[in-house]
């Protein structure tokens, strides 16, 4: 999971 990641938020750019």
Swiss-Prot record:
Keyword terms of this UniProt record: Amidation, Neuropeptide, Secreted
Modified residues (3-phenyllactic acid): 1
Modified residues (Alanine amide): 4
Record carries keyword Secreted: yes
Compartments, as annotated in UniProt: Secreted
Keyword Secreted: yes
Gene Ontology CC, one term: extracellular region
GO biological process: neuropeptide signaling pathway
Job of this protein: Inhibits spontaneous contractions in several muscle groups. May be involved in the expansion phase of feeding behavior in sea anemones.
Protein name in the entry: Antho-KAamide
């Amino acid at each position: 999971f990641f938020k750019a």
